[in-house]
């Protein structure tokens, strides 16, 4: 375990006196040019021990004193204690002085004294500038805040509604009518654990409502024609006074300190923040609010910012109301950094952010995609504090000094950081967006380019909701700190740029994002995500650069964004996103365009998260295979009219009852299967998947594999069985479901059939011979093993899952029936079918003949699948278990589950290997080939966004063939793989083997 040592920055000065130790926060100060005498400098001196107030107050004889100024004595320092007993050092322009009109920096030496005794001296630099940092950040952030509904409670109040609320607040001394949450502190409750008291109801329901009303009034104060900056002065004054009253009344009744709540006469906790973060333990607060604190902080941002210039000016004028409100806001916003008790367990690997003491594998507290949500309030805090050096929080467990004893002495709740001044603190949090995941079931960015957030059951694919915000919301912070002393370093920009360039465009086809990895946004407008959200992120990143920011490939990103904006973006390739068991196979750069993708899941991963009232995405991840040519085959409208029991690629019982509604967004759970994986060499790809659902709604099990050839996809299935009783319906493999807008043609048993849009068809055709289906630009070829029943459904024959969102646009479904009890009926308990893009119905007979002549495929002993294309000279093997398979004249025998692709060209072999059952511990994968390959040690570089040095594949002669030993990434190699070896264990490993002697060419 790596021990983390907290290192003080230059402006954190340890002050020692006897047994007492003080850490001084004096990082940044500025004042405007032309400031007259007595003008307060922005930025105050603070002590870390201020966090212990009000329970432990700073000694009353502490004071600050300027010992020396480089220039004439331009400033003086005053010592001030607030109502909680916290000490501050306040600089002012000295009497008879002015800062002048020239920008410069004044340096001085300051002492912290206890009476007449000097405890420590420290340097201070005061910047005299035309615009203070506070003014600059305020100018930048207020418009941004007004553009985000959450920061004013998403309340766009009419002027009439605002007038009514002003009257309510004025009459109620700051209180809105109809709320019971305005109770004096401490709040007192009786609680018996064995018998929950029904009178103890969540307090946050009303708090959130009050926050949102205040937020709406704050927005009106900024933007209303009557109450806004250009509105009626008297009306505006009335709203301002009402906001002061409403904020004071509300913030003063929300418990923050541990003794603000008494349970059975005892304080609920002993730390700042406990007053709110522990309420859930007693049924007094909803857990989601406890962990999503921005629900209570965000709505007050706009009203607080709108009033802040007046509040700070009021403080300068010794206005008691302004001072009380400011102190109440600082107290209230401590809830934002309060953490629920369970998540404070720093050495518990099961808690939200893992074992925080293991800094090699955990990035600490808040290491998840909710940092995008948190950043909204974070960026407001320096402006609300009106100070640069007051720490971002007084919640004590965020400080290294909180951890006194070995082995956790000097531990940091977030590695490498302890609060030391809000401006520096928030700047630092803007660097915590690109957090890597080190293991399955951990939030973070994966080496394959995907990202996970909700990991309660397994690794998820959150490429739109949560993940995209985690990647890009930092641009607000980059812009906020642009060209300041707190600007963000270039590598943090580069992290985002690399993924905007190298990852996301590959998921876009014809202006549409792939719904299979969109997370909870799967049913949103994913065309808008591409044309607006993504393109805005590119522009925001470019605009957020400081003058000294250095980025690679920015011009390339801008060129790609331009092509996307004109809906002209095309690319070709096959990529495996192996951590999330997802693969994309597409063409379009120089070929007829199409896009195919495959999503699997396993005991390591989950499918599509679903927060819908009517569950739909239950089967997402169960071997789902989609093929797009036009680009809108699975858009928002198609998905809204879908039977979600019949996703393309799925093998399952075709039920017609509602999908389970209970159990949360990931109730579909990970699979119970170990074997699932994807493999790609850049041109070709494959997937292997043992369908073995853990949840009890699904009824089937199967061994499934997928083979992505140049312009065809072959899907094989075997060992299809009933796993559970289910609903008693037949088990099917669904070939496709999409909008029924073109003639649907199918040829089976020597007969041609057609259905036209608007026609409702329910056809079941038995056949023992190859058949084909066609619609639009896509064709399907089905190759029976013995006897199949081809199912065609269109129009009203489709059981739409959610009629509330359906618009009546009909879909079609093509499926293969395996019977109620596969293997026990006169229907195949296996399947083989192809999907072919860019084909007409007239061309399908020719394609069928070409397939029969070109492809050799087998399912050996049900547990090994393989295919050989004579035309493309590629062999692909899927081993669900140890065994051997001969295909295309080459036998491969594997000692473990594996994926193997062997592509032969005139001058070289391309060998690709994947481990579909990664555990991070397996050291080698070994197999034998009857075809002899040139012997040698061939180094490989694992695939991914950022390439790392890999290991090697050893090929040695074995009889007339070869023995191949693949050195896998494993736990011994943790540091080599940046402590992500568990994730790299499933990475596609690709080498090129020259047929002639000479140097080896490595695939990059």
Regions from the PLM with identified roles:
Residues 20-206, 994-1004:
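Mature N-terminal, pre-catalytic/accessory segment of carbohydrate-active enzymes
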Residues 62-67, 414-432, 436, 556, ...:
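Generic detector of solvent-exposed, compositionally biased contiguous segments
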Residues 1-4:
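Positively charged n-region of N-terminal signal peptides that target proteins for export
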Residues 470, 477-939, 943-958, 971-989, ...:
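Extended polysaccharide-engagement surfaces of secreted carbohydrate-active enzymes
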Residues 73-75, 87, 713-714, 909-911, ...:
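Hydrophobic residues embedded in beta-strands of well-ordered beta-sheets
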Residues 136-146, 155-522:
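Aromatic-lined, polymer-binding surfaces characteristic
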